[in-house]
Amino acid sequence: MIETPTVTLEEDGIIFVDFRSLLVTLDLLYDGLNQQRALAPKKKSKVLLVGQAATKVDTDMIEFGACAETVQLTAAVAIVPLSKIGWILANLFMPLQRNPYPTRAFDTIEEGREWLLSLDAG
C-alpha cells in the first residue's frame, strides 16, 4: 500500500494536509489536492500543509501551486515544516513560488491556522 498524506476538512473550514513523516513529492501533492477536491468540491479553501520536508524543490514543485487545478481549489496556504531540512527547503521555495494566493511558512500549526483564519474568505 502506498502511503499518502492525511487530508481532513476541519471544523473551522481549513483543509489540513498532514504528510507526517512522508517526504513530500509532486505525486503526494496531487494526491492531497485530489483529497481536498473530494472534501470541498468547487470551493476555494484555506490549506494548512504540515510535513517534514520535500524530496526536492524543482520547477514542477514550484509550479504546482500556480497550476490551474490548484488555483481553482486554493484561497491561501500555510506551510509548517517539522524539521530543520524542511525549513531550509521552505526558505528556498518561498522566494521562487508563483502562487496567486497568499502563501507563508510558520513555526507552529497554531500560528499557521491563526494566519489562515485572519484572511478574508477566498
Model-identified regions with their sequence ranges:
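Amphipathic, Lys/Arg-enriched alpha-helical "gate/interface" segment within cytosolic domains
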Residues: 1-122
